[in-house]
Protein backbone atom coordinates (compact mmCIF):
# COMPACT_ATOMS: atom_id res chain seq x y z
CA UNK A 1 0.00 0.00 0.00
CA UNK A 2 1.42 3.34 -0.99
CA UNK A 3 1.39 6.30 1.34
CA UNK A 4 2.06 9.78 -0.01
CA UNK A 5 3.80 12.38 2.10
CA UNK A 6 3.47 15.85 0.66
CA UNK A 7 4.22 19.44 1.48
CA UNK A 8 1.22 21.48 2.54
CA UNK A 9 1.45 23.57 -0.58
CA UNK A 10 2.22 20.83 -3.06
CA UNK A 11 -0.93 21.49 -5.06
CA UNK A 12 0.45 24.94 -5.83
CA UNK A 13 3.91 23.72 -6.74
CA UNK A 14 4.95 21.97 -9.92
CA UNK A 15 8.67 21.50 -9.37
CA UNK A 16 8.65 18.98 -6.52
CA UNK A 17 9.62 15.47 -7.50
CA UNK A 18 7.66 12.62 -5.93
CA UNK A 19 10.30 10.05 -5.01
CA UNK A 20 9.49 6.42 -4.28
CA UNK A 21 11.26 5.02 -1.21
CA UNK A 22 11.41 1.22 -0.98
CA UNK A 23 12.64 -0.62 2.14
CA UNK A 24 14.51 -3.85 1.40
CA UNK A 25 15.39 -7.06 3.26
CA UNK A 26 13.96 -6.51 6.72
CA UNK A 27 14.14 -2.71 6.82
CA UNK A 28 11.07 -1.10 8.38
CA UNK A 29 10.28 2.57 7.79
CA UNK A 30 8.33 3.58 10.90
CA UNK A 31 8.05 7.34 10.35
CA UNK A 32 8.71 9.59 7.36
CA UNK A 33 9.02 13.36 7.77
CA UNK A 34 7.44 13.15 11.20
CA UNK A 35 4.43 11.12 10.05
CA UNK A 36 3.82 7.52 11.10
CA UNK A 37 3.88 5.02 8.24
CA UNK A 38 0.96 2.57 8.09
CA UNK A 39 2.85 -0.14 6.19
CA UNK A 40 6.51 -0.09 7.38
CA UNK A 41 7.65 -2.76 4.91
CA UNK A 42 5.96 -1.29 1.84
CA UNK A 43 7.18 1.36 -0.66
CA UNK A 44 5.96 4.93 -0.23
CA UNK A 45 6.07 8.20 -2.15
CA UNK A 46 7.58 11.35 -0.66
CA UNK A 47 6.81 14.74 -2.18
CA UNK A 48 9.76 16.65 -0.80
CA UNK A 49 13.34 17.49 -1.70
CA UNK A 50 14.60 15.87 1.50
CA UNK A 51 13.41 13.12 3.80
CA UNK A 52 13.77 12.10 7.42
CA UNK A 53 13.16 8.38 7.88
CA UNK A 54 12.92 6.61 11.23
CA UNK A 55 13.88 3.02 10.49
CA UNK A 56 14.71 -0.20 12.24
CA UNK A 57 15.96 -3.57 11.03
CA UNK A 58 14.34 -6.88 11.95
CA UNK A 59 15.35 -10.29 10.63
CA UNK A 60 15.93 -13.91 11.57
CA UNK A 61 19.69 -14.41 11.55
CA UNK A 62 22.00 -17.41 11.85
CA UNK A 63 21.28 -21.00 10.90
CA UNK A 64 19.99 -24.16 12.52
CA UNK A 65 19.84 -24.06 16.31
CA UNK A 66 21.70 -20.74 16.27
CA UNK A 67 18.86 -18.88 14.55
CA UNK A 68 17.62 -15.84 16.44
CA UNK A 69 15.30 -12.95 15.64
CA UNK A 70 17.18 -9.65 15.75
CA UNK A 71 15.42 -6.30 16.20
CA UNK A 72 17.48 -3.14 16.06
CA UNK A 73 16.86 0.10 17.86
CA UNK A 74 15.27 2.82 15.69
CA UNK A 75 17.62 5.08 13.74
CA UNK A 76 16.86 8.51 12.28
CA UNK A 77 18.16 8.71 8.71
CA UNK A 78 18.23 12.07 6.95
CA UNK A 79 18.52 12.37 3.16
CA UNK A 80 19.17 15.97 2.14
CA UNK A 81 18.91 15.52 -1.61
CA UNK A 82 15.99 13.31 -2.61
CA UNK A 83 15.92 13.68 -6.38
CA UNK A 84 15.08 10.13 -7.53
CA UNK A 85 13.44 6.89 -6.46
CA UNK A 86 15.55 5.03 -3.92
CA UNK A 87 15.91 1.68 -2.19
CA UNK A 88 17.04 1.41 1.42
CA UNK A 89 19.17 -1.65 2.21
CA UNK A 90 20.26 -2.83 5.68
CA UNK A 91 23.87 -3.50 6.67
CA UNK A 92 25.21 -6.90 5.62
CA UNK A 93 24.96 -9.04 8.75
CA UNK A 94 24.71 -12.82 8.96
CA UNK A 95 24.51 -13.62 12.67
CA UNK A 96 22.79 -12.23 15.74
CA UNK A 97 26.13 -11.36 17.32
CA UNK A 98 27.37 -9.58 14.18
CA UNK A 99 24.14 -7.59 14.01
CA UNK A 100 24.49 -6.59 17.67
CA UNK A 101 27.98 -5.24 17.01
CA UNK A 102 26.93 -3.44 13.82
CA UNK A 103 23.92 -1.69 15.35
CA UNK A 104 25.74 -0.72 18.54
CA UNK A 105 27.69 1.86 16.57
CA UNK A 106 26.74 3.47 13.26
CA UNK A 107 25.21 0.79 11.03
CA UNK A 108 26.16 0.94 7.37
CA UNK A 109 22.86 1.31 5.55
CA UNK A 110 23.02 1.47 1.77
CA UNK A 111 20.71 3.83 -0.08
CA UNK A 112 20.70 3.35 -3.84
CA UNK A 113 18.94 5.45 -6.46
CA UNK A 114 17.39 4.12 -9.67
CA UNK A 115 20.36 5.64 -11.47
CA UNK A 116 22.56 3.13 -9.65
CA UNK A 117 24.44 5.71 -7.60
CA UNK A 118 24.65 5.58 -3.83
CA UNK A 119 22.76 8.34 -2.04
CA UNK A 120 24.49 10.10 0.86
CA UNK A 121 22.76 10.34 4.22
CA UNK A 122 23.33 11.12 7.88
CA UNK A 123 22.00 9.14 10.82
CA UNK A 124 21.47 9.19 14.56
CA UNK A 125 20.24 6.52 16.91
CA UNK A 126 16.88 7.61 18.33
CA UNK A 127 17.20 8.28 22.05
CA UNK A 128 14.70 6.21 24.01
CA UNK A 129 13.21 6.44 27.48
CA UNK A 130 14.81 4.94 30.57
CA UNK A 131 13.66 1.54 31.77
CA UNK A 132 11.88 -1.24 29.91
CA UNK A 133 10.31 -0.62 26.51
CA UNK A 134 12.43 2.51 25.91
CA UNK A 135 10.76 3.18 22.56
CA UNK A 136 7.16 3.07 23.76
CA UNK A 137 5.53 6.29 22.59
CA UNK A 138 7.86 6.66 19.64
CA UNK A 139 5.94 9.56 18.13
CA UNK A 140 6.72 11.68 21.20
CA UNK A 141 10.37 10.62 21.11
CA UNK A 142 10.68 11.68 17.48
CA UNK A 143 8.94 14.98 18.19
CA UNK A 144 11.43 15.63 21.00
CA UNK A 145 14.35 14.64 18.74
CA UNK A 146 13.24 17.13 16.09
CA UNK A 147 12.41 19.90 18.55
CA UNK A 148 15.90 19.71 20.07
CA UNK A 149 17.40 20.12 16.59
CA UNK A 150 15.01 22.79 15.36
CA UNK A 151 13.55 20.50 12.69
CA UNK A 152 10.03 21.33 11.51
CA UNK A 153 8.03 19.57 8.80
CA UNK A 154 5.15 20.94 6.77
CA UNK A 155 4.46 17.49 5.38
CA UNK A 156 1.42 15.31 5.99
CA UNK A 157 0.05 11.96 4.97
CA UNK A 158 -2.61 11.90 2.28
CA UNK A 159 -4.55 8.67 2.65
CA UNK A 160 -6.81 7.05 0.10
CA UNK A 161 -9.81 7.15 2.42
CA UNK A 162 -10.58 10.72 3.46
CA UNK A 163 -13.58 11.35 5.73
CA UNK A 164 -14.76 14.91 6.35
CA UNK A 165 -17.39 16.11 8.78
CA UNK A 166 -18.69 19.45 10.02
CA UNK A 167 -18.75 18.31 13.64
CA UNK A 168 -16.36 16.42 15.84
CA UNK A 169 -17.77 13.02 16.77
CA UNK A 170 -17.23 12.19 20.42
CA UNK A 171 -16.19 8.60 21.09
CA UNK A 172 -18.40 6.71 23.52
CA UNK A 173 -16.76 6.06 26.89
CA UNK A 174 -17.11 2.31 26.29
CA UNK A 175 -14.52 2.47 23.49
CA UNK A 176 -11.71 3.85 25.67
CA UNK A 177 -10.58 0.45 26.91
CA UNK A 178 -10.61 -0.94 23.37
CA UNK A 179 -8.55 2.02 22.16
CA UNK A 180 -5.99 1.45 24.93
CA UNK A 181 -5.73 -2.23 24.01
CA UNK A 182 -5.21 -1.44 20.33
CA UNK A 183 -2.50 1.07 21.19
CA UNK A 184 -0.74 -1.39 23.49
CA UNK A 185 -0.85 -4.10 20.80
CA UNK A 186 0.55 -1.63 18.26
CA UNK A 187 3.56 -0.69 20.39
CA UNK A 188 4.17 -4.31 21.39
CA UNK A 189 4.51 -5.19 17.70
CA UNK A 190 6.92 -2.28 17.22
CA UNK A 191 9.05 -3.30 20.22
CA UNK A 192 12.31 -5.22 19.90
CA UNK A 193 12.73 -8.78 21.19
CA UNK A 194 14.46 -7.54 24.36
CA UNK A 195 11.74 -4.94 24.96
CA UNK A 196 9.06 -7.61 24.62
CA UNK A 197 10.85 -9.86 27.13
CA UNK A 198 11.10 -6.99 29.60
CA UNK A 199 7.42 -6.16 29.13
CA UNK A 200 6.32 -9.78 29.70
CA UNK A 201 8.44 -9.91 32.88
CA UNK A 202 6.84 -6.69 34.07
CA UNK A 203 3.36 -8.14 33.40
CA UNK A 204 4.17 -11.23 35.50
CA UNK A 205 5.42 -9.02 38.34
CA UNK A 206 2.07 -7.16 38.37
CA UNK A 207 0.08 -10.34 39.06
UniProtKB/Swiss-Prot annotation:
**Domain of life the protein comes from:** Bacteria
Which Pfam families does the protein's record reference? DUF2057
Stretch forming the signal peptide: 1-18
Q: Which InterPro entries match?
A: UPF0319
Record's keyword annotation contains Magnesium: no
UniProt keyword terms in alphabetical order: Signal
Concerning its family, UniProt says: Belongs to the UPF0319 family.
Show the PANTHER family listed in the entry.
UPF0319 PROTEIN YCCT
Name of the protein described by the UniProt record? UPF0319 protein VV2327
Organism of derivation:
Vibrio vulnificus (strain YJ016)
Amino acid sequence: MLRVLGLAGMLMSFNIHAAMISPVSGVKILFANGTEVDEPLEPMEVDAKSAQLVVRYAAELGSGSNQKVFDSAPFVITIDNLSEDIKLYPPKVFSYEQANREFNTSPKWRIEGVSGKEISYSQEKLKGNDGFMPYYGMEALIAKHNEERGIVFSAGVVKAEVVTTDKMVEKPATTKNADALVQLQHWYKQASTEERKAFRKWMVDQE
